[in-house]
């Protein structure tokens, strides 16, 4: 365990970004958890990875000459007070990269973090979407020209989603990691603010599976899914045309066909169905 970066405060305990290092040698894989204060699931998954990797290291199962770094959270201040964003200016840490060493606290934090982790061969970030919702666990990548969907398939999750970046995406960790020639992956599970054990175990297994397939650890695992690569531009929104109470009829990952009822919009006063979403 070691400190990656410290933010000093006059009125509260210093915020230390802690990293857990396993193995010695080439900077092979870095795993980053919660960047926002409500990403409890992401921090929990990293804690379970620390637990698993510590056990593997004690059993001599980290490959020689390979180093793995796990950072459970880079925004402990916001986690402690249950605020999504950082500091009095409500900065989004995952929209503050690459940062600089002379600006606002969020910029100094992201600059110091990226300086520390930019040389890793593989970068894995557990993050949350900018909109709330329910997800099938999947790997998401930026279409920067450096992305490698074949590597993303090695996580063994159901889907790999490739997104063409818009200007705001250039401030994310994933984009800036790729800009530093790190093979970067963002992993999404189906919860943020609370722990979902099923998808958390799936995420831990996916990362350990990836590390094994890249030759970083010795670990027995099942092969997982044959991932389906999806481009975000090929996805479609299904809008509701009426206001009211949304009642879903299916969940993320369910099989649906054209014409199937996916949800209802309920009148909030008399309970009648205003619209069926097909």
Residue ranges of predicted features:
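Structured catalytic-domain cores with a bias toward divalent-metal coordination
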Residues: 1-278
